[in-house]
Amino acid sequence: MLEGLVSQESLSLNSMDMSVLERLKWVQQQQQQLQQVVSHSSNNSPELLQILQFHGSNNDELLESSFSQFQMLGSGFGPNYNMGFGPPHESISRTSSCHMEPVDTMEVLLKTGEETRAVALKNKRKPEVKTREEQKTEKKIKVEAETESSMKGKSNMGNTEASSDTSKETSKGASENQKLDYIHVRARRGQATDRHSLAERARREKISKKMKYLQDIVPGCNKVTGKAGMLDEIINYVQCLQRQVEFLSMKLAVLNPELELAVEDVSVKQFQAYFTNVVASKQSIMVDVPLFPLDQQGSLDLSAINPNQTTSIEAPSGSWETQSQSLYNTSSLGFHY
């Protein structure tokens, strides 16, 4: 029994080794066929070259995939052994071989090309989709940032408006208080200026009236324009009058040496009384003179007058003429108008 079991196990292992060798030979044949197809094909596409490179660089992967079809032996032998080539509970002889169906290489190449194209398209679409999504996210972020900035700006504007309103109200209150004080002070100043202006107008009116009165009194002032010129003329006229008064007082002192009047000490009333007395005395003297008869032609008849009386009359008349001439000369020398 043991010999039979050992023989069966050795046969199975030998058959397994033969199948692996046949598998390797088949893989080499497939690679040679692929190379021949690619060399004889007129359309050498880059996809086929990529496939060949993939198959040439990954021979180990193909081998592994080929060996993956074979199941590993378990701990038990006999009924549990199965190679995948037939039903279990059967033994394989050395002469048995694995009959492989022929595979269309063109179909395999087309399938692999389609798969690579699909993978490439997926890889291309992924970044496009990513870029679109990124653009959408960026747009959303921008919109959110803009809305936040606008909200912040609105809030800032509201705060600034509120602060400006409060500042305006405070400034208005302060300005109103200042305006009230200013108006009060300005009103007082205006009242003072108005009073001053009214007083000044009244004073100027009085001065103008007095100047007009002086113009009427003083001869020659109507020809002068300007208050300064008028005042100069008035001063000259007053000085001339003063000189005339002094001259008259001197003449009176000569005529009446007993009185010895001092012009500076004599008051105006006394001066007026003295002149009235002098005029009365002159009139009494003229009353004593007889009336002169008139001729038919209206001339005086001096034959009725005594020669003594005529001499007495002629003497004072001559003295009065000399006095009048002297007064005229002094007036002409002292004042010119």
Swiss-Prot record:
Cross-referenced Pfam families: HLH (PF00010)
A Gene Ontology molecular function term of the record: DNA binding
Residue segments, region Disordered: 119-180
SMART domains in the cross-refs: HLH
Compartments where located: Nucleus
GO (cellular component) term, any one: nucleus
Positions of the bHLH domain: 191-241
Gene Ontology BP term (one): gibberellic acid mediated signaling pathway
Composition bias, Polar residues: 152-165
Major localization class: nucleus
Other comment: Plants over-expressing HBI1 show increased petiole length and early flowering, and plants suppressing HBI1 display dwarf, short-petiole and late-flowering phenotype. Although HBI1 contains a degenerate basic motif it can bind DNA in vitro.
Record protein name field: Transcription factor HBI1
Designated gene of the protein: HBI1
